[in-house]
Design a protein with these regions (language model features):
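Charge-dense, helix-prone N-terminal extensions
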Residues: 1-115
């Protein structure tokens, strides 16, 4: 899956906004961020072809050990809640599943708070 296909997939999840919130920072113009309920569920580095998504803490060790293309996130992210994904090596279906999972985690958390 290429970057544009991935972007389209994220937007297809519904109620998703995309922004370049770091565009004024050096190198920040290549970091596309996807939001649901006003909160981030995915960071996509357009230059590096990598993605960072939220994940359940109990799933992270197994994914890191067994899933090709899943790696620790950049040092800016908590390894307790986030995983890195290499778009060039991950299986497309796993990429979609992990992205939807991140979307659902964030949406579920913040939809409850709005009620």
């Amino acid at each position: 899956m290429n970057i544009e296909e991935y972007r389209e997939y994220c937007l297809s999840l519904g109620e998703v906004e995309e922004k370049l919130p770091f565009a004024k920072m050096p190198g920040g113009d290549t970091l596309l961020v996807f939001y649901v309920c006003g909160h981030t569920f995915c960071y996509c580095d357009l230059h590096e072809f990598t993605v960072v998504v939220k994940c359940q803490t109990e799933r992270i060790p197994e994914l890191l050990a067994t899933a090709e293309g899943v790696e620790p996130p950049d040092s800016h992210f908590s390894t307790k809640y986030w995983i890195g994904i290499n778009l060039q090596t991950i299986d497309t279906e796993l990429l979609k599943e992990l992205t939807r999972n991140s979307f659902e985690i964030v949406k579920g958390k913040y939809e409850r708070k709005r009620k």
